[in-house]
Amino acid sequence: MDEYHIPVLLDEILSFLVKEKNGIYIDTTFGGGGHSLSLLNKLSNKGRVIAFDKDIDSIKNNNILDARFNLIKTNYRFIKKKIKLFNLNKVSGILADLGISSHQINSPKRGFSIRYNSILDMRMDTYNKINAQHIINNYSYNELYNLLIRFGEVKNAKNISKLILKHRKKKYIKSTFDLIKILNFFYKKKNKFLSKIFQSLRIEVNDEINALKDLLKNSLSILKPGGRIAVISYHSIEDRIVKKFLKTGNFNGIIPYDEYGNNLSPLILLEPRIIFSSKEEKKENNRSRSAILRIAEKKI
């Protein structure tokens, strides 16, 4: 099977997420379609899957031909608006497999990987105007510093930001290898350091944190009582957001209580501990190694 099509934590998703075999489920990150296809196989003839993806490559590569399935090119932050196209207001379950797909990281022209010399792009939706090249060459010192701290928790963010500004005055920074060459003074563990830099840029390019918050808020709104939401994250920055929201229904992580001390959080965590992929899956699928799954159910 092509790595593009290997779904992460599939058994766990099917076990926890599918509560109603006649229900309507949303796959907010279609990717190669592995999760969507498996959900369809789990559901009855009356069940339905609606999938979203902002990457045109994912849309073009879809090979699921099933009357119970619909695929829409859009950012998952618009989930609430888009399901109205199908005259829907509530759904039985929602799946979000966050982060970058194997297809994107392994596509040399997309600029996501430190392995390939390509244009600094990093757009998941290639119709967007802003790419990583624009950010590197146009952001101010403060803007660069803040995104490195917020989205990568990068050490030496001050010096790195200053060095980027210094080099871009001399020459426009075009490619991934241009940037890596500039940064070679800073890293001891090359892959780990550069991955954090690239992660910071990718999150900024795709507005991933704000999109995630929109997704979570809208998911809570359209999830029917007793419906479930499953979120797979790949780094601590997005996982902290997911953890707080699924536990409390807000982003400050404070559980709301009424005057009698009753917990007013709209969701219940089905598994209080983080769900990780098995040792066997980690051997077969590299992407699953950093995967963190959290699942919650909307209170009835």
Swiss-Prot record:
<dbReference type="GO" id="GO:0005737">
    <property type="term" value="C:cytoplasm"/>
</dbReference>
<comment type="similarity">
    <text>Belongs to the methyltransferase superfamily. RsmH family.</text>
</comment>
<dbReference type="InterPro" id="IPR029063">
    <property type="entry name" value="SAM-dependent_MTases_sf"/>
</dbReference>
<dbReference type="GO" id="GO:0071424">
    <property type="term" value="F:rRNA (cytosine-N4-)-methyltransferase activity"/>
</dbReference>
<feature type="binding site">
    <location>
        <position position="53"/>
    </location>
    <ligand>
        <name>S-adenosyl-L-methionine</name>
    </ligand>
</feature>
<keyword id="KW-0963">Cytoplasm</keyword>
<feature type="binding site">
    <location>
        <position position="78"/>
    </location>
    <ligand>
        <name>S-adenosyl-L-methionine</name>
    </ligand>
</feature>
<protein>
    <recommendedName>
        <fullName>Ribosomal RNA small subunit methyltransferase H</fullName>
        <ecNumber>2.1.1.199</ecNumber>
    </recommendedName>
</protein>
<comment type="function">
    <text>Specifically methylates the N4 position of cytidine in position 1402 (C1402) of 16S rRNA.</text>
</comment>
<feature type="binding site">
    <location>
        <begin position="33"/>
        <end position="35"/>
    </location>
    <ligand>
        <name>S-adenosyl-L-methionine</name>
    </ligand>
</feature>
<keyword id="KW-0698">rRNA processing</keyword>
<keyword id="KW-0489">Methyltransferase</keyword>
<dbReference type="InterPro" id="IPR023397">
    <property type="entry name" value="SAM-dep_MeTrfase_MraW_recog"/>
</dbReference>
<feature type="binding site">
    <location>
        <position position="104"/>
    </location>
    <ligand>
        <name>S-adenosyl-L-methionine</name>
    </ligand>
</feature>
<keyword id="KW-0808">Transferase</keyword>
<feature type="binding site">
    <location>
        <position position="97"/>
    </location>
    <ligand>
        <name>S-adenosyl-L-methionine</name>
    </ligand>
</feature>
<keyword id="KW-0949">S-adenosyl-L-methionine</keyword>
<dbReference type="GO" id="GO:0070475">
    <property type="term" value="P:rRNA base methylation"/>
</dbReference>
<dbReference type="Pfam" id="PF01795">
    <property type="entry name" value="Methyltransf_5"/>
</dbReference>
<dbReference type="InterPro" id="IPR002903">
    <property type="entry name" value="RsmH"/>
</dbReference>
